Curated annotation (Swiss-Prot):
Domain of life: Bacteria
NCBIfam families named in the record: efflux_EmrB, PRK10504.1
Organism: Escherichia coli O17:K52:H18 (strain UMN026 / ExPEC)
Cytoplasmic compartment spans: 33-48, 98-101, 159-164, 218-224, 284-285, 363-395, 452-471
Periplasmic side: 1-11, 70-76, 125-137, 186-196, 246-262, 307-341, 417-430
Protein name per Swiss-Prot or TrEMBL: Putative multidrug resistance protein MdtD
Keyword set, alphabetical order: Cell inner membrane, Cell membrane, Membrane, Transmembrane, Transmembrane helix, Transport
Source lineage: Bacteria, Pseudomonadati, Pseudomonadota, Gammaproteobacteria, Enterobacterales
């Protein structure tokens, strides 16, 4: 890294700032949701859509980001991503209704979807291959700091200013990043194949309408007939994509990917697994504030041990997987995460608040081990010519499953509770207890998928550096 030219190091800093903005925004909102609900005159049970609108937009737009960067140029697309993200942040802060906020979050999601993958592509183009891993470690480090600062910073801003400031802080950073991108980043382009627009639209429609239908009549205000229509449209769109992709070498995601058994199992497990674990970052600060009466800042601080546990476990997860094999690790961490979820609920309802940081630290460790294992299992056996496509599909599924998880968590709260819940009441705690029990059950279900993974430790080693560089 030290022998890189000055202009290359500046370009890496620009990418790192983009990673930081995107990762900070995924966590800073969570602790502000109850305050947003009060300010906008909405029930806290509806606020999960603030997260879903962002994450679902990222999932929908991800497949197009790499192609756009190759076609239009990495500088142009990265600049556009920062501008859209910054404008979305401004519109979020100016929103006076929930619907306005959801539209602004979707605009943020378009920028966020392009920022991270185009940033990775930029690093691949400006850094020699032998220094790629060191450069990626450098630019992704701020992305790890973002989730650490996000909850506490969000709580601090909400408690001592207002929720609008969790979006306003993005504006000066975004302006500086946009100017620096235009001045310092080269506009690399590559010859591209024809973009599969038909496949992209079919997948986008299928994902969006099915997630919207899952929110139910209470969340969307739609009639049962309209929701049934959405489900039908979504299913038809996905079936049409499968027919479109069959024997189509130019399909957005080739069906040849699923001939690799570990990819199929890993992708199915990642989808189901992240539905369950995607509920936790949303539900935990909401439960701490509405169910237990914590202040926004205190609730944000309570999330830090979970992030620390996750970061600490990444250092040894490869050794753990190589020692015990993917099947044992994934089944154990899936069931373990379910048990830790129950332990958190029990500890909180008993009033043992001093134990909660240790439980959340353990939750972060278990979750991190499972995430890393799921990712490497999914990609490790793919042939080199399918590695990039498989990585893109996995990234899309990760975002989609998290949006579905948050949607289901909001649906569970709506099923067990009324439209308005009061802070720190017995009824509210009962609602959260039933919701948490349901979440623990959902989190445990992917163990049935992971139990089918071959348990040959020598074959199921962590993904090689050669394949990582090919993605």
């Amino acid at each position: 890294m030290t022998d890189l030219p000055d202009n290359t190091r500046w370009q890496l800093w620009i990418v790192a700032f983009g990673f930081f903005m995107q990762s900070l925004d995924t966590t800073i909102v969570n602790t502000a949701l109850p305050s947003m609900a009060q300010s906008l005159g909405e029930s806290p049970l509806h606020m999960h859509m603030v997260i879903v609108s962002y994450v679902l937009t990222v999932a929908v737009m991800l497949p197009a980001s790499g192609w756009l960067a190759d076609k239009v140029g990495v500088r142009n697309i990265f600049f556009t991503a920062i501008v859209l993200f910054t404008l979305g942040s401004l519109f979020c802060a100016l929103s006076g209704t929930l619907n306005e906020l959801l539209l602004a979050r979707a605009l943020q999601g378009v920028g966020g979807a392009m920022m991270v993958p185009v940033g990775r592509l930029t690093v691949m183009k400006i850094v020699p291959r032998e220094q790629y891993m060191a450069a990626m470690t450098f630019v992704t480090l701020p992305g790890q700091v973002g989730p650490l600062l996000g909850p506490a910073l969000g709580g601090l801003l909400v408690e001592y200013a207002s929720w609008h400031w969790i979006f306003l802080i993005n504006i000066p950073v975004g302006i500086i990043g946009a100017i620096a991108t235009l001045m310092l980043m080269p506009n690399y382009t590559m010859q591209t194949r024809r973009f599969d627009l038909s496949g992209f639209l079919l997948l986008a429609i299928g994902m969006a309408v099915l997630t919207l239908a899952l929110d139910g009549s209470k969340g969307t205000g739609l009639s049962p007939l309209a929701i049934t229509g959405l489900v039908a449209v979504g299913v038809v769109a996905l079936v049409l994509y499968l027919l479109h992709a069959r024997n189509n070498n130019r399909a957005l995601f080739s069906l040849k990917l699923f001939r690799t058994r570990t990819f199929s199992l890993g992708l199915a497990g990642s989808f189901a697994g992240r539905i369950g674990s995607g509920m936790l970052p949303f539900m935990t600060p909401v439960f701490l504030q509405i169910g237990l009466g914590f202040s926004p800042f205190h609730a944000g601080l309570m999330m830090i041990p979970m992030v620390l546990g996750s970061m600490g476990m990444k250092r040894i997860v490869v050794q753990v997987v190589n020692r015990f094999g993917y099947r044992r690790v994934l089944v154990a961490t899936t069931l373990g995460l379910s048990l830790v979820t129950l332990l958190f609920m029990t500890t909180a309802l008993l009033g043992w608040y001093y134990v909660l940081p240790f439980v959340l630290f353990l939750q972060g460790m278990v979750n991190s081990t499972r995430f890393s294992s799921m990712n490497t299992l999914t990609l490790k056996d793919l042939p080199d010519n399918l590695a990039s496509s498989g990585n893109s599909l996995l990234s899309m599924i990760m975002q989609l499953s998290m949006s579905i998880g948050v949607t289901i968590a909001g649906l569970l709260l709506g099923l067990f509770g009324s439209q308005h819940v009061s802070v720190d009441s017995g009824t509210t705690q009962t609602v959260f207890m039933y919701t948490w029990l349901s979440m623990a059950f959902i989190i445990a279900l992917p163990a049935f998928i992971f139990a089918r993974v071959p348990n040959d430790t020598h074959q199921n080693v962590a993904i090689s550096r050669r394949k990582r560089s090919a993605q």
